[in-house]
Amino acid sequence: MVKYKWSYLRILFFVIPILYGCSTPVSMIPPIREEPGIIIPRAILSEFDKFKVRRWKYIVIHHSASYKGSASSIDKYHRNIKGWENGLGYDFVIGNGRGSRDGQIEVGGRWNKQIKGAHAGDDEYNEYGVGICLIGNFEKNRPTRSQISSLVYLIKYLQRRCNIPKRNVIMHRDIKDTVCPGRRFPHYKLMARL
């Protein structure tokens, strides 16, 4: 009973408020692990569903192509090296334990402000695509189990919240000449879980 109570409280106090927008540019969500018997009460989700989100059509999956990192390190790179005024080009970043906790979902300022992304290299997908970046180089390694669990949770939430169909959950390579999110990314296994 205590285990389930903690899971319920974790969702109530950490996950739900952050997904519905906070005032800080990068927020953090504790890692979400698959645990049997966890049910997200509909009352909590419906309470926060009254917040308005802009029209989203796609979810675009990326990898950072780096061994380590976090939303703040990518934000710094995007601001200082690429010169992007709004910084972090993604809406969400999922950590691998090297730079941020394994499976930790970090929420970027673009999601909080509901503004256009800078992740797809294509106007349509930057404008209407929610960008999710997993830390790691999936040409060389696979994502961690915690990263995939958090990704599945986040995608399901976004599908429900933004009415995005499964066919519009796409890999960056589907829209741009790139290997992103890497050949070792378990695309088909991910799609089977959605």
Where are these regions (language model features)?
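Bacterial N-terminal signal peptides that target proteins for export
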Residues: V2-I11
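Secreted/periplasmic proteins that engage bacterial cell-wall peptidoglycan
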Residues: F51-R110, K116
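Basic/polar, cationic surfaces and motifs that engage anionic cell-wall
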Residues: V2, C22-V60, N96-G99, Q104-V107, ...
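Bacterial N-terminal signal peptides
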Residues: R10-Y20
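Soluble, non-transmembrane domains of envelope/secretory-pathway proteins that act on or interact
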Residues: Q114-Y125
